[in-house]
UniProtKB/Swiss-Prot annotation:
Gene3D superfamilies: P-loop containing nucleotide triphosphate hydrolases (3.40.50.300). It comes from Rhizorhabdus wittichii (strain DSM 6014 / CCUG 31198 / JCM 15750 / NBRC 105917 / EY 4224 / RW1) (Sphingomonas wittichii). Consists of three domains, a large central CORE domain and two small peripheral domains, NMPbind and LID, which undergo movements during catalysis. The LID domain closes over the site of phosphoryl transfer upon ATP binding. Assembling and dissambling the active center during each catalytic cycle provides an effective means to prevent ATP hydrolysis. Some bacteria have evolved a zinc-coordinating structure that stabilizes the LID domain. Catalyzes the reversible transfer of the terminal phosphate group between ATP and AMP. Plays an important role in cellular energy homeostasis and in adenine nucleotide metabolism. Its EC number is 2.7.4.3. ATP binds at G10, A11, G12, K13, G14, T15, R127, A200. This is Adenylate kinase.
Length: 215
């Protein structure tokens, strides 16, 4: 089972991918993480990517495709892949088909976590964490049981991410739409796209994804 998981920042894509990794033994292929790991490990593709990045240039499709291929080659045939952040262009979508086919794999589903932009803004701008233990809270959905005191460690210090503001969230939504717009029609034409309500309860989102994969 090989899937592409799509969703704007804050839609819970990372949470759902982690659950698929834990529950089904799938492997998450996040191009950003893979790029950093390849550079750190000094693999041939990593060295090539490092030279490109140090020159201030964008990493080419060829390098990204090489990373994907390298990762798939290290996986057991029984392990499914979750593609995160790739493909982003029609050319990359076709390249992924070739990469999978050459390894006896196919793309089974493209799952998009749909969100309401205004509700997503509220979800993201209201979140904060304990500065000591990292426990997560929300202005509306999850307040500490005792105001100003962390439920887990008792700390009175909390912090918010500086980019959890409305302007940044809306900019990211626009960027997400611009990046996914080219590839969704490609997969819709092939009947691969399934949409899930990303604003639902986390467990309900997980159940909806599981139903798609088990169908």
């Amino acid at each position: 089972m090989n899937i592409i998981l799509l969703g704007p920042p804050g839609a819970g894509k990372g949470t759902q991918a982690s659950k698929l990794v834990a529950d089904r033994g799938m492997v998450q292929l996040s191009t950003g993480d893979m790029l950093r790991a390849a550079v750190k490990a000094g693999t041939p593709i990593g060295l090539k990517a490092k030279a490109v990045m140090e020159a201030g240039e964008l990493v080419s499709d060829e390098i990204v495709s090489g990373l994907i291929g390298e990762k798939l080659d290290s996986m057991a045939a029984s392990e499914g892949a979750i593609f995160d952040g790739y493909p982003r262009t029609e050319a990359q979508a076709h390249s992924l088909d070739e990469i999978l086919a050459s390894r006896g794999r196919v793309l089974d589903h493209v799952i998009e976590l749909e969100v309401d932009e205004d509700a997503l803004v509220e979800r993201i701008t209201g979140r904060y964490t304990c500065a000591n233990c990292g426990e997560g809270y929300h202005d509306r959905f999850k307040q500490p049981k005792v105001a100003g005191v962390c439920d887990v460690c008792g700390s009175a210090e909390f912090k918010r991410r500086p980019d959890d503001n409305e302007e940044t969230v809306r900019t990211r939504m626009a960027e997400y739409r611009a990046k996914t717009a080219p590839i969704l029609p490609v997969y819709e034409a092939r009947g691969l796209v399934r949409r899930v309500d990303g604003m639902a309860d986390m467990a309900d989102v997980s159940a909806a994804i599981a139903a798609i994969l088990d169908n």
